[in-house]
Amino acid sequence: MDKHLSPGFASYHAQRILATPNVVTITEVALGIITLYLLGSYIVRRNSLPPGPRGLPIVGNVRDLPTERPWLFWAKHKDIYGPISSITVMGQSFIIVNELQIAIDLLDKKSAIYSDRPRLEFAGEMIGWNRQMILSQYGERFRTMRKFVKEFIGTKAAVVQYRPLQEIETRYFLARVLATPEHLADHLRLTAGAIFLRMSHGYAIDTEKPDALVNLVETAAKEFYIATSPGAWLVDQFPALQKLPNWFPGTHFKKVAAEFFEHNMEQADRPHEFVKRRMNAGTALPSFTSRMLERGLDEKDDEVVRWAANSLYGGGTDTVVASLSAFFLTMVLYPEVQKKAQKEIDTVIGTDRLPTLDDRSRLPYIEAVLKEVLRWHPIGPMGIPHRVTEDDVYNGYLIPKGAIVLPNLWMFAHDPSQYHNADEFKPERYLETDGNVPELDPHALAFGFGRRACPGQELADTNMFLTIAMSLAVFNISKAVDEKGREIEPVNEFSSGTVSHPKPYKCKVTPRSASAEELIRLVGDDHMNRPTDANDL
């Protein structure tokens, strides 16, 4: 055969070689290279993340997720992996932050890329909580909503005008507690609802019987915690499940979502339309909603105001209730703190009047009690998750675009490098005395970070101060007793929701003296005969 092969023969010979099973084709080589590249990229990416437990193939760390008290679960990561760690579940990266300075470095200093929220299919898309500020995606709509709320209550100067409302409603709270102390939790909710609904919509609650709007807000809040429970809803991992027909097995979540959606829309729509009717009739009281609507907003901004107002009373009410419930619990658990606080009030204010916000600067121990309530058990112990919108690198670790960042506020508040004997309730830690350097003010961590920090913290802070100071001025708070006169130890546990409330506990609330009871009764008759807007809702 001629050693110089013709082109046709060479082509035929090459085809035979490529058709041989044992010969690797160019396509196979390319696929192998691509596979190795992707696998290598994944390994490098995984190794570049903050340290964390090794996951399973495909599902990752699905077995490493907590079912309750996540703040304690994630706090253990700090001992094992350090102050920043990570897990990956179904391809989704989670970054757990257990040190305050890291949270500040990321969520405050780099808030431009750390201010988004994760997309929650069940709570956000199906129930509509992504319309409210708490789960709204970061963008123009969120910025407008936050701007409106901050303008209304975002500064000390802005909240001064609401002092009379806060003080009178707190006095009404004292009267209700005096009448039925066994319903303390209900009185806390009613008072918070009265303040925030008056501010958000100019709405006067019903004090004679359970108020329909207050109940609706509370129902929606409870459903929010159910809807946002981590890992509870498979549709969050597999959004395509929404498209299954309602009769298909396993789609009960669609019925639940429809019910929750109705309650969520109703709690936003009913008070908003109430204000519009009152404005048309010329009888609307000044409020956040009426002030915004007077600007003649277009349909787009009208919708923003509707949900900004919902954020104002919905978010504000529940967080204040949780904090004040924790306050009453600590007074039962730490009676020596209560005695010191009462002594300060008696010395500075006397016993013939109630403390007011004007007295705040003269009551440093009461101020310290408030701070310790915020620290001892942060009512949002895991904060609200942030989502990073760009790849970032922190201390050599990759935080990939789309990662969900979980700031462990509880760990920040129990960091032994910041707070000694952190599990103890010790207001003295904030006082500057001989030999004592004040520890970190928990306001630095309790209200969130960056552009997602709570815009209503000034208002919440003044509400808490008034309730704490006035309650200690006139009430003794102690352990409840059973029918045989034996003291009942209060339950010292907290729920695992986004807002963490003390679990139901019993306590005894009694007037400190006859003169204290008289101070309470000065407003008692007035609050029982107040007009209500409940019938016009």
Curated annotation (Swiss-Prot):
Membrane topology per record: Single-pass membrane protein
GO molecular function: heme binding; iron ion binding; monooxygenase activity; oxidoreductase activity, acting on paired donors, with incorporation or reduction of molecular oxygen
Keyword Oxidoreductase set for record: yes
Segments traversing the membrane: 23-43
Stored PROSITE patterns: CYTOCHROME_P450
GO cellular component, one term: membrane
Sequence positions that bind heme: C454
Enzyme superclass (EC): oxidoreductase
The reaction(s) this protein catalyses: (2E)-geranylhydroquinone + reduced [NADPH--hemoprotein reductase] + O2 = wigandol + oxidized [NADPH--hemoprotein reductase] + 2 H2O + H(+)
Domain of life: Eukaryota
Entry EC number(s): 1.-.-.-
Required co-factors: heme
Pathway: Secondary metabolite biosynthesis; terpenoid biosynthesis
Keywords: Heme, Iron, Membrane, Metal-binding, Monooxygenase, Oxidoreductase, Transmembrane, Transmembrane helix
Compartmental location: Membrane
Family according to the record: Belongs to the cytochrome P450 family.
Role, per record: Cytochrome P450 monooxygenase; part of the gene cluster that mediates the biosynthesis of clavilactone A, a meroterpenoid that features a unique benzo-fused ten-membered carbocyclic ring unit with an alpha,beta-epoxy-gamma-lactone moiety, forming an intriguing 10/5/3 tricyclic nested skeleton. ClaR, ClaS and ClaT are sufficient to produce clavilactone A. ClaR acts as a macrocyclase to catalyze the oxidative cyclization of the isopentenyl to the nonterpenoid moieties to form the benzo-fused macrocycle, leading to wigantol.
Protein name (Swiss-Prot/TrEMBL): Cytochrome P450 monooxygenase claR
Organism classification: Eukaryota, Fungi, Dikarya, Basidiomycota, Agaricomycotina
